[in-house]
Amino acid sequence: MIAVIGLLLGFLVSALFLIQGKRRRTNDNQEKKRSSSEPVEDVVRPKSYSKSEVAVHNKRNDCWIIIKDKVYDITSYVEEHPGGDAILDHAGDDSTDGFFGPQHATRVFDMIEDFYIGELH
């Protein structure tokens, strides 16, 4: 008799947890649907820079470059650059050709995104 009551009690507790979990998932799904249908107010758009704005950032301690019409602030990377001061050859200017040169490992294509600050207009 005690075993039957124990099994029944275990079944009821399990059922309660299952019902609560389903209810929580349903609420989460409803919240996702609501939030995806609401207009997004805080869309972050990339900043836009002119070539002349980028051009003033042409020093070791203030170094921006352009790669395929995207602007990158690489100031914090200049001292780490394995190619030394070659990175400064196009500081404040378009560095697309140099960036895609044979001297760069493919990992630079992932790394560069960490320095992205906007688009060229």
UniProtKB/Swiss-Prot annotation:
One MF term in the entry's GO annotations: metal ion binding
Keyword terms, alphabetized: Heme, Iron, Membrane, Metal-binding, Transmembrane, Transmembrane helix
Compartments, record wording: Membrane
Residue span of region Disordered: 24-49
Residues binding heme, per UniProt: 81, 104
An annotated GO cellular component: membrane
InterPro entries: Cyt_B5-like_heme/steroid-bd (IPR001199), Cyt_B5-like_heme/steroid_sf (IPR036400), Cyt_B5_heme-BS (IPR018506), Cytochrome_b5 (IPR050668)
Stretches with biased composition (Basic and acidic residues): 26-36
Transmembrane residue ranges: 1-21
Pfam families cross-referenced by the UniProt entry: Cyt-b5
Cross-referenced PROSITE patterns: CYTOCHROME_B5_1 (PS00191), CYTOCHROME_B5_2 (PS50255)
Origin: domain of life: Eukaryota
The keyword Transmembrane is assigned to this record: yes
Membrane topology according to the record: Single-pass membrane protein
Major site of localization recorded for this protein: membrane
Ranges where the Cytochrome b5 heme-binding domain occurs: 46-121
Family: Belongs to the cytochrome b5 family.
Protein's recorded name: Cytochrome B5-like protein
Encoding gene, per UniProt annotation: CB5LP
